[in-house]
UniProtKB/Swiss-Prot annotation:
Positions with a binding annotation for ATP: 30-33, 51, 87-91, 416, 480-482, 496
Organism of this sequence: Pseudoalteromonas translucida (strain TAC 125)
PROSITE patterns cross-referenced by the UniProt entry: CHAPERONINS_CPN60
Name listed for the protein in its UniProt record: Chaperonin GroEL
Gene that encodes the chain: groEL
Entry GO terms, CC: cytoplasm
């Protein structure tokens, strides 16, 4: 086991704080409508220019092990916020940096770290309740477009196209994907399709490694209502598909052992392009969903219950689709070859079942199935002049899409950092059990001003002046950093999803609290890989006389 270096107390916290500040300072310049770009070097190809906080955070790795630990913990804040709400990574990073800096000052002054953490936790819980009270539902297309616009760094075109996509495929149940377009303009395509929450059974099926996805064009789709473990059952189908030179997607109850291993080997050798996923749902619901996919793709479910055997399956039993995209978590079938009359009949059948259903859960699941059959998939094609611009714009569209989904889910609050300032101003009378907890509460409340300060700083204005002006107002009154005006944020269309702001605050408070209570850090001592000493060559000095 390699030797370790251990740092304690102030030394450990100082190193950790350096790492926190390096990462946070690189991320926070992207915040707000006038946020700056960050250029990321890539080992091949042109550098990437981005205003996406989580993309910047992911690139940062520091040489000093202890500083790197601090940076990685803040990276965790950004990535947790991104996973929970799909946006708010920069806000979460700014909040965490402020809490850690102020908290560690208090620890250095002799306060109890555990009490500080309890105070911070208390303030965060109270602030989340205030944010929920401030929240208003996001129900109309205009509000959805405004949320998308703000999240895409004030790009109105992106906000509008996302609102259109949601209008066409449904706000709650519709599936929206983002792709690279072929033109300079953003385009919206609505394609008949279905998405379900089952990913590839083996990462060896991946054929688009940069995205980590499996993409199959014009595949055959084999639907099987049982577990497949014996490859012999699949051989006739595989041979028929190989002759047709088309890819194959297998959707079955499960695939294991020899069958899965053989498919992986065939795929890697290029004999037949194949991928496999588990069928969605469980029990009777799985049977129904397999039947939905069969109707959508024009295939037949191979089920022994109706006398069909897998070994006797023919190409006629297989469904087809224009495209299938499989990630580690879900599968999207685009433009299935099923007949419209069959799909409409199936939708009517599900509608009738919804009317008869007694439990809310059953109704919800049936509505999901109907949306997947009837709603289709909206594809936003991002247009740009160069590859660099394309990557940057695609990041922003994905952020904006996540933000609008979060807004539909939990509503919206006034944007531009105002909601956090309002929540903090309502909590000035909040007290803890002792003086150190009170200070922890103050640390959290002061941190809640940090996102607004950073937005104003990035816009080139004086943060303290703006903070005081916003605090003097009430309700939705705030500062529009894009135009330099003060007004009602919701009327100006500056909205943040409640879920994004709430998640950012909760994750920042949680991880920053852990950092404040750190008392020791352990890291491996780096090996010295310098070249060995060439001491034996010293005797060659006498060659000087040969001149």
């Amino acid at each position: 086991m390699a030797a370790k270096e251990v740092l304690f107390a102030g030394d450990a916290r100082a190193k950790m704080l350096t790492g926190v500040n390096i990462l946070a300072n690189a991320v926070k310049v992207t915040l707000g409508p006038k946020g700056r770009n960050v250029v990321l070097d890539k080992s091949f190809g042109s550098p990437v220019i981005t205003k996406d906080g989580v993309s910047v955070a992911k690139e940062i790795e520091l040489e000093d092990k202890f500083e790197n630990m601090g940076a990685q913990m803040v990276k965790e804040v950004a990535s947790k916020a991104n996973d929970a709400a799909g946006d708010g990574t920069t806000t979460a990073t700014v909040l965490a940096q402020s809490i850690v800096n102020e908290g560690l000052k208090a620890v250095a002054a002799g306060m109890n770290p555990m009490d500080l953490k309890r105070g911070i936790d208390k303030a965060v819980i109270a602030a989340v309740a205030e944010l929920k009270a401030l929240s208003v539902p996001c129900s109309d297309t205009k509000a959805i477009a405004q949320v998308g616009t703000i999240s895409a760094n004030s790009d109105k075109e992106i906000g509008d196209i996302i609102a259109q996509a949601m209008e066409k495929v449904g706000r709650n149940s519709g599936v929206i994907t983002v792709e690279e377009g072929q033109s300079l303009e953003n385009e919206l395509d609505v394609v008949e399709g279905m998405q379900f929450d089952r990913g590839y059974l083996s990462p060896y099926f991946i054929n688009s490694p940069e995205k980590g996805t499996v993409e199959l064009d014009n595949p055959f789709i084999l639907l099987v209502d049982k577990k497949i473990s014996n490859i012999r059952e699949l051989l006739p189908t595989l041979e028929a598909v190989a002759k047709a030179s088309k890819p194959l997607l297998i959707i079955a109850e499960d695939l294991e052992g020899e069958a899965l291993a053989t498919l992986v080997v065939n795929n890697m050798r290029g004999i037949v392009k194949v991928s496999a996923v588990k069928a969605p749902g469980f029990g009777d619901r799985r049977k129904a969903m397999l039947q939905d996919i069969a109707v959508l793709t024009g295939g037949t479910v191979i089920s022994e219950e109706i006398g069909l055997e897998l070994e006797k399956a023919t190409v006629e039993d297989l469904g087809t689709a224009k495209r299938v995209i499989i990630t580690k978590d879900d599968t999207t079938i685009i433009d299935g070859a099923g007949e419209e009359a069959g799909i409409n009949g199936r939708v009517s059948q599900i509608k009738a079942q919804i009317e008869e259903a007694t439990s809310d859960y059953d109704k919800e699941k049936l509505q999901e199935r109907m949306a997947k059959l009837a709603g289709g998939v909206a594809v936003i094609k991002v247009g740009a002049a160069t590859e660099m611009e394309m990557k940057e714009k695609k990041d922003r569209v994905e952020d904006a899409l996540n933000a609008t989904r979060a807004a539909v889910e939990e509503g919206v609050v006034p944007g531009g950092g105002v909601a956090l300032v309002r929540a903090a101003s309502k909590l000035v009378d909040l007290v803890g059990d002792n003086e150190d907890q009170n200070h922890g509460i103050k640390v959290a409340l002061r941190a809640m001003e940090a996102p607004l300060r950073q937005i104003v700083t990035n816009a080139g204005d004086e943060a303290s002046v703006v903070i005081n002006a916003v605090k003097a107002g009430s309700g939705n009154f705030g500062y529009n950093a894009a135009t330099g005006e003060y007004n009602d944020m919701i009327e100006m269309g500056i909205l943040d999803p409640t879920k994004v702001t709430r998640s950012a605050l909760q994750f920042a408070g949680s991880i920053a609290g852990l950092m404040i209570t750190t008392e020791a850090m352990v890291a491996e001592i780096p090996k010295d890989d310098s070249a060995p000493d060439m001491g034996g060559m010293g005797g060659m000095g006498g060659m000087g006389g040969m001149m």
